Amino acid sequence: RTGFNNPGLDMIKLRIAQRRNSYVLGININKNPSSEGKQAIDDFLSLYRELYDTADYFTINWNSVETEVMEQALTALAAFRETRTKHVPLLLKLPADLTEEALNVVTACIDNYKIDGVIATGPTMDRTYLTASLNRLQKIGTGSISGKGIGDKSFRIVKFLRGHVGKNV
């Protein structure tokens, strides 16, 4: 099941403290489902601040909020990060369905907010590239697609990013 189901910040911090230093810890932060606008930005920033000294890196799902809110959140995260001596990398996790126009916005954000890396890509709801029979797809049920089902889409995004931001991201 996809989504951001979790027991809450305090429980997550406790679990991390109990297992710290036994692995590389990437933390995917997101807004609360009911948050919009400024509250969504505050959600991102609150988690980032609370977990900054704990994480080895952070990820944010690009499509979790509208582009304008994402840019405002990235502005807030970049401003906070500049106040810290420790650099914790920040990565954007991109969906497989981004248009070229959206990718241009992503590359601008990578430059503007000093994004350290990209995870290309997360799942898609598009089943166009699946080769299973309709009967098989109905048995599988609804939900997002990953793996071979998004290979071509992911490759297109990686190729675009390589051409626009290079190999250092």
Language-model features and meaning:
Residues 41-93:
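Loop-centered beta-sheet repeat module
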